[in-house]
Regions:
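Phosphopantetheine-dependent thiolation modules in NRPS/PKS and related acyl-activating systems
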Residues: 2-82
């Protein structure tokens, strides 16, 4: 799986959780760039991402995630472990 595939899947998850069809993500996208991406929705997003990609993040992993690119990298890292 590559970064673009992960990014595309994450876009679908973001649209579903935030109930907005016009969300466009790139590696530099942060919570400040997306209306409605707050701490509560962040946990919902992480939960759906973990289920979609069959990965688990520790609290420490989650705290380190600063943008969408970091999430993609974390997913790839977890996928390599399995």
């Amino acid at each position: 799986m590559d970064t673009q595939t992960i990014l595309n899947e994450m876009s679908l998850i973001f649209r579903e959780v935030l109930k907005r069809e016009n969300i466009v993500l790139d590696n530099e996208t942060t919570a400040q760039d997306v209306e409605g991406w707050d701490s509560l929705t962040n946990m919902q997003l992480i939960n759906k991402i973990e289920k979609k990609f069959n990965v688990r993040f520790t609290f420490r992993d989650i705290v380190k995630l600063k943008n969408v690119g970091d999430i993609c990298h974390a997913i790839l890292t977890e996928l390599v472990k399995t």
